[in-house]
Amino acid sequence: MGRFISVSFGLLVVFLSLSGTGADCLPDWSPYQGHCYRVFNQKMTWADAEKFCTEQANGGHLASFHSSKEVDFMVSLAFPMLKVDFVWIGMSDFWRDCEWKWSDGAKLDYKAWNNELNCFVSKTTDNQWLRWDCSRTNNVACKYPL
């Protein structure tokens, strides 16, 4: 009986330690502060990338960022796979209504861009965004809430 209680308690501890640490993310997705992230080595336009992300997970969109640490986390996922390259992120004025927005509807509370044009990519080497032609093709960074 004592062994059963010990094993049951051990399993409970393992379960509780895994909850919220990625156990809730889909396979191949990485958890960070209540969201799951995945970088895809597939080139597509910004509009196709946003559609692709919405098809990958419930609540999925191109990644939005709210701190430099969050961008650094995405870079840590992207650089080993893509080396020096770019990934689409959710920031755009794709609809040309003169209002910069995240595709997931999140508040624009952190900015790290330069250049011009209507969509954004993030470099895979540092915390910098570039305004980019939406019709060009790039790899994809997706995010969904837990």
UniProtKB/Swiss-Prot annotation:
Q: Which family does it belong to?
A: Belongs to the snaclec family.
Molecular function GO terms recorded: toxin activity
- What pairs make up the disulfide bonds? 25-36, 53-142, 119-134
Subunit structure, interactors included: Heterodimer; disulfide-linked.
Tell me which UniProt keywords the record has, alphabetically: Disulfide bond, Hemostasis impairing toxin, Secreted, Signal, Toxin
Q: In which tissues is it expressed?
A: Expressed by the venom gland.
Q: What is this protein called?
A: Snaclec CTL-Eoc124
| Lineage of the organism | Eukaryota, Metazoa, Chordata, Craniata, Vertebrata
Signal peptide location: 1-23
Q: Which Gene3D superfamilies has this protein been placed in? A: Mannose-Binding Protein A, subunit A (3.10.100.10)
Question: Which SMART domains does the entry link to?
Answer: CLECT
What the entry lists under Pfam families is as follows: Lectin_C
- Where in or outside the cell is it found? Secreted
| Function comment | Interferes with one step of hemostasis (modulation of platelet aggregation, or coagulation cascade, for example).
Q: Name one GO cellular component term.
A: extracellular region
Q: What is its main location?
A: secreted
The organism encoding this protein is Echis ocellatus (Ocellated saw-scaled viper)
